[in-house]
């Protein structure tokens, strides 16, 4: 998923996407432990996507807090 697509997600969609990627990551780690991992690069890719989703979610919540604080002070 591209960053522009990630930024367009709603708050509920962030949680769904993160949960889906973490579940897939868990399954891939299990496959790696069993020695049956077909795409080892996918583990790195999923970890990166989870981190990007978490970063975007925190950026958006921080921006919302700042907007609320500036709105109160006016």
From Swiss-Prot:
UniProt xrefs under Gene3D superfamilies: 1.10.287.310
Keywords noted in UniProt: Ribonucleoprotein, Ribosomal protein
Pfam families: Ribosomal_L29
A GO cellular component annotation in the UniProt record: cytosolic large ribosomal subunit
GO biological process: translation
Classification via SUPFAM superfamilies: Ribosomal protein L29 (L29p)
Entry's Gene Ontology molecular function annotations: structural constituent of ribosome
Family listed: Belongs to the universal ribosomal protein uL29 family.
Protein known as: Large ribosomal subunit protein uL29
Organism placement in taxonomy: Bacteria, Thermotogati, Deinococcota, Deinococci, Deinococcales
């Amino acid at each position: 998923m591209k960053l522009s697509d990630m930024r367009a997600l709603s708050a509920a969609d962030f949680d769904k996407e993160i949960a889906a990627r973490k579940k897939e990551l868990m399954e891939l780690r299990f496959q790696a432990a069993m020695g049956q991992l077909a795409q080892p690069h996918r583990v790195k890719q999923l970890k990166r996507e989870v981190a990007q989703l978490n970063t975007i979610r925190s950026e958006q919540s921080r921006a919302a807090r700042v907007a609320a604080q500036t709105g109160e002070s006016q």
